[in-house]
Amino acid sequence: MPQPAPLDFVVVGLNHQTAPVEVRERVAVRPEEEGALLGHLARHADEVLLLATCNRTEVYLAGVHGDPLAAFEGAWGHALLDHLYVYRGEAAVRHLYRVTAGLDSLVIGETQIQGQVKRAWQSARERGLSGTLMNKVVQGALAAGKRVRSHTGLSDKVVSVSSAAVELAQAALGELSQRRALILGAGETAELTLTHLRAAGVQDVLVVNRTAERARALAEKLGGRACPAEELSAALPEVDVVIASSAAPHYVVTAQNVREALAGRPGRAMFLIDISVPRILDPEIASVPGAHLYNLDDLTAVVQRNMQSRRAALPQAEAIIRELGSDLSRWYLTRETQLARQAELALACD
């Protein structure tokens, strides 16, 4: 009887550990680009899942034909080899399990990634790109994420990118209750950021989004003030902290905007934290006197301080990942063996 084929599952990608934000933003995926990217990748595999977050862009492939590295680089048109990793077979399965459980995140144990994986899978299914193997692997990944969070203390009092950004502002400014803040964006991360700002005592938070209705809805929900996007420049002199968590094809706040804002508030510094990928705060802001600019990569120190209390949960979490990864490999081997036997019987009948 023919030997069962090896587990035909591959991941190729980059993340915050292999690429700085300057590289990650080059492969960030905007919603309007997703269909074309998946169409390109589908020429290299039977099943495709594209997972793109602020800290990673990864392509999961099943039924691969061709070089997955070339498929990734061809999709984005950049020479990215120095930043890419490739895992195959069970190693690729375990990687997705670790990602979904929050073990591979900048903020270890964060929970947003579970929903991001689920949405990526839904997108693949809607386009007919998730078949038997991809469905099984992703279902296993979602189960792994739930099991790690419910059976370990990894997600207890977990810090998020949003809370880390607010903590960074507190470290720079001290007590925030007398400070004014401005959030760029109205999505899930912006909502978390506003929640943490309010918890830190900030009474006055402006919410700016290019869709005014979304800004109003978020402000009303959590006690902020909606600010029309066209009034952003006028609002900047009022605020001490700007946290950007939105998507835009260009810089929303430029160095000149900040220079003019600071001229209207002499002697008062401004702290700007960009947790968007691609970044929407002009990096040149860092050269403006009185402006202090941070991005996602600057949050590492904050995250590491908050990680100490959860390190004890890591061995148990990794053991769960190994166990469930092995279960998937056994399922695949059993399935392939059965298919091989069926093929052999069919030949014998002929």
UniProtKB/Swiss-Prot annotation:
**Which reaction(s) are listed as its catalytic activity?**
(S)-4-amino-5-oxopentanoate + tRNA(Glu) + NADP(+) = L-glutamyl-tRNA(Glu) + NADPH + H(+)
Active site per database record: C54 (nucleophile)
Q: What is its EC number?
A: 1.2.1.70
Annotated site residue numbers, Important for activity:
H95
The Gene Ontology terms for molecular function here are: glutamyl-tRNA reductase activity; NADP binding
User: Could you name the domain of life of the organism this protein comes from?
Assistant: Bacteria
Keyword annotations for this protein, in alphabetical order, are:
NADP, Oxidoreductase, Porphyrin biosynthesis
Sites binding NADP(+) sit at G185, A186, G187, E188, T189, A190
> What is the top EC class of this enzyme, as a single word?
oxidoreductase
Which parts of the chain are coiled coil? none
Name a single GO biological process. Answer: protoporphyrinogen IX biosynthetic process from glutamate
How does the entry describe the domains? Possesses an unusual extended V-shaped dimeric structure with each monomer consisting of three distinct domains arranged along a curved 'spinal' alpha-helix. The N-terminal catalytic domain specifically recognizes the glutamate moiety of the substrate. The second domain is the NADPH-binding domain, and the third C-terminal domain is responsible for dimerization.
HAMAP family registered for this protein in UniProt: Glu_tRNA_reductase
Database matches in PANTHER family? GLUTAMYL-TRNA REDUCTASE (PTHR43013:SF1)
Q: Which miscellaneous remark does the UniProt record hold?
A: During catalysis, the active site Cys acts as a nucleophile attacking the alpha-carbonyl group of tRNA-bound glutamate with the formation of a thioester intermediate between enzyme and glutamate, and the concomitant release of tRNA(Glu). The thioester intermediate is finally reduced by direct hydride transfer from NADPH, to form the product GSA.
Record's protein name: Glutamyl-tRNA reductase
